[in-house]
């Protein structure tokens, strides 16, 4: 086992604070509409330019192991806030640094860190309650666009495209971000339920111009096994042909004589039919087939539920207004399923999302839910260069998370003002002793810090602006984008309440842990010298060979 170094007391705390400050100082320059860029070196390829706090934090690893402990703890604040709310990482880092800085003044003066922590927790709980009271629900596309724009570092175009996407697919819909092919941002909306499986034979194509198979008002057969024998399928085909409707067959696979017969029927015009593979694998495939069944008002033909292909009737088949089958995608538009059944299915998926432990499972469940609830919107981010594209894409993703958070818990005035107004809730708050009162004072001072940093990044005097904002009330604040004071909600400077709340809670949680730290343990630095080479790079003092 490698030897360890141990630091105690003030020496340990000084090292942690040093690490906290190095990371926080690099992150906080990005805060606000006039925040600066940070350039991140890459071991290969072009450097990355970013204004995203968590991207900067993730890159920082300090040489001094004790300082690195402090940096990693604050990195945790940024990551946790990004996971919870998707944005607010820089605000969380600034708050954590402020609480640590103010807290260590009291620790150095001999205050009990455990009581300081209790005071901090008390103050944060009161501010969180006040933030909930201050927040108002987002009701208009304009508000959603404003939240998105602020989160994307005051880029109104990004705010607008996100608001349009939410308009199209609803608050429950899935919005994905992809690399675009042009210089401008584009929005692509897929209506209905789409899955990533296409036609099994190009002979099913009935629209050669678009290279798609289109079916109007088709029946939809859902089968969870492979179909190779046409005899199994004949009874259903005859019933569908009598009804005079087209047919979409979704099965684990269709091959052999079954596929050949379907192709021949299509070519001869006897029956308009398209066969596609069922999406997904294993249990996920069964779940998606069940989703399609509920959306189209049909049933999955499966032995498990006592249904067989030979005995299937038209009542077991689903229906949709329109189906489009491309080479790699199938889209079902306007399924005939009942609204109540779809709502019940969405609720059951919600319960699975809440219980999901892995991000992958959660993402796939949210995708299923969105396909049932509204549809899918794809934002294609355009830029002139690869470096700009990466930076812009990160901002779009941040803005998307922020708008979702705004829809979830409402909005509060931005620009650091919400925390200042919520501070009123703890002005008269008292702890159980004077040390807890000191913990409350730490938070009172720390909540000014986001506004101070926004102002400093805009090149103005922080103390003057904070004093002026505190003289006002309600939504009155400082708009760093234009240097004006006024009603921030009217000016569209908004923050999601969830982002502000998560930033404060995560910052206080980690900062309070740092304050109560009294010893640090880290691996001993390796003092071995580098392997000695020949002097002057080659034998006899000559340079080494050139290649």
UniProtKB/Swiss-Prot annotation:
Asked whether the UniProt record includes Cytoplasm among its keywords, one would answer yes
Q: Where in the cell is it found?
A: Cytoplasm
Q: What GO biological process terms are annotated to this protein in UniProt?
A: protein refolding
Q: Which Gene3D superfamilies match?
A: GroEL, GroEL-like equatorial domain, TCP-1-like chaperonin intermediate domain
EC code(s) of this entry: 5.6.1.7
GO MF assignments? ATP binding; ATP-dependent protein folding chaperone; isomerase activity; unfolded protein binding
Instruction: Give the matching InterPro entries.
Output: Chaperonin_Cpn60_CS, Cpn60/GroEL, Cpn60/GroEL/TCP-1, GroEL-like_apical_dom_sf, GROEL-like_equatorial_sf, TCP-1-like_intermed_sf
Enzyme category, top tier: isomerase
User: Which positions does UniProt annotate for ATP binding?
Assistant: 30-33, 51, 87-91, 415, 479-481, 495
Annotated Pfam families: Cpn60_TCP1 (PF00118)
Q: Which domain of life is it from?
A: Bacteria
Name the SUPFAM superfamilies for this protein: GroEL apical domain-like, GroEL equatorial domain-like, GroEL-intermediate domain like
Q: Where is this region: Disordered?
A: 528-547
**Biased amino acid composition, Gly residues:** 535-547
Keyword Nucleotide-binding found: yes
Q: What keywords does the record list, in alphabetical order? A: ATP-binding, Chaperone, Cytoplasm, Isomerase, Nucleotide-binding
Primary location class = cytoplasm
Cellular component aspect of the GO annotation: cytoplasm
Q: Which reaction does it catalyse?
A: ATP + H2O + a folded polypeptide = ADP + phosphate + an unfolded polypeptide
- Functional summary from the UniProt entry: Together with its co-chaperonin GroES, plays an essential role in assisting protein folding. The GroEL-GroES system forms a nano-cage that allows encapsulation of the non-native substrate proteins and provides a physical environment optimized to promote and accelerate protein folding.
How this chain assembles, per its entry, is: Forms a cylinder of 14 subunits composed of two heptameric rings stacked back-to-back. Interacts with the co-chaperonin GroES.
Q: Which family does it belong to?
A: Belongs to the chaperonin (HSP60) family.
Protein name stated in the entry: Chaperonin GroEL 2
Organism name: Azoarcus sp. (strain BH72)
């Amino acid at each position: 086992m490698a030897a360890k170094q141990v630091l105690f007391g003030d020496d340990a705390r000084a090292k942690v604070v040093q690490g906290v400050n190095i990371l926080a100082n690099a992150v906080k320059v990005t805060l606000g509409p006039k925040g600066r860029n940070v350039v991140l070196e890459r071991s290969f390829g072009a450097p990355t330019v970013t204004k995203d706090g968590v991207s900067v934090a993730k890159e920082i690893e300090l040489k001094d192991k004790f300082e690195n402990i402090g940096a990693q703890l604050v990195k945790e604040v940024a990551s946790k806030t990004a996971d919870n709310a998707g944005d607010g990482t820089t605000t969380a880092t600034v708050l954590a640094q402020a609480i640590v800085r103010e807290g260590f003044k009291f620790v150095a003066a001999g205050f009990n860190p455990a009581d300081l922590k209790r005071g901090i927790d008390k103050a944060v709980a009161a501010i969180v309650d006040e933030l909930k009271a201050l927040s108002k629900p987002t009701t208009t596309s304009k508000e959603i666009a404003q939240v998105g724009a602020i989160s994307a570092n005051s880029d109104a175009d990004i705010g607008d495209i996100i608001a349009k996407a939410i308009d199209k697919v609803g608050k429950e819909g899935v919005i994905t971000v992809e690399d675009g092919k042009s210089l401008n941002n584009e929005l692509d909306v897929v209506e209905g339920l789409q899955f990533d499986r296409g036609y099994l034979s190009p002979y099913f194509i009935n629209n050669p111009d678009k290279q798609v198979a289109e079916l109007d008002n088709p029946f939809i057969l859902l089968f969870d096994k492979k179909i190779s024998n046409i005899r199994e399928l004949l009874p259903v085909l005859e019933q569908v042909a009598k009804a005079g409707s087209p047919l979409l067959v979704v099965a684990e696979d269709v091959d052999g004589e079954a596929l050949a017969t379907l192709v021949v029927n299509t070519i001869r015009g006897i029956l308009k039919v398209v066969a596609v593979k069922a999406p997904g694998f294993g249990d996920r495939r069964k779940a998606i087939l069940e989703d399609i069944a509920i959306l189209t008002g049909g049933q999955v033909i499966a032995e498990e539920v006592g249904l067989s292909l030979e005995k299937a009737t038209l009542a077991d088949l689903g229906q949709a207004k329109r189906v489009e089958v491309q080479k790699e995608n199938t889209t079902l538009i306007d399924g005939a399923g009942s609204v109540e059944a779809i709502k019940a299915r969405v609720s059951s998926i919600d319960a699975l999302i809440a219980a999901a432990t892995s991000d992958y499972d959660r993402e796939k469940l949210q995708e299923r839910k969105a396909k049932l609830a509204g549809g899918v919107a794809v934002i294609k981010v355009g830029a002139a260069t690869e470096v700009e594209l990466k930076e812009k894409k990160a901002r779009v993703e941040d803005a998307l998370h922020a708008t979702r958070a705004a829809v979830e818990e409402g909005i509060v005035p931005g620009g650091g003002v919400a925390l200042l107004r919520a501070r009123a809730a703890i002005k008269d708050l008292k702890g159980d002793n004077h040390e807890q009162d000191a913990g409350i004072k730490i938070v009172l001072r720390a909540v000014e810090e986001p506004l101070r940093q926004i102002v400093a990044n805009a090149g103005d005097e922080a103390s003057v602006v904070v004093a002026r904002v505190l003289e006002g009330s309600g939504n009155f604040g400082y708009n760093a984008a234009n240097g004006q004071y006024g009603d921030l909600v009217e000016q569209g400077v908004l923050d999601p309440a969830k982002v502000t709340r998560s930033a404060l809670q995560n910052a206080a949680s980690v900062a309070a842990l740092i304050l109560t730290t009294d010893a640090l343990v880290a691996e001993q630095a390796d003092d071995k010298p580098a392997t000695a080479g020949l002097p002057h790079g080659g034998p006899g003092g000559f340079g080494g060979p050139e290649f």
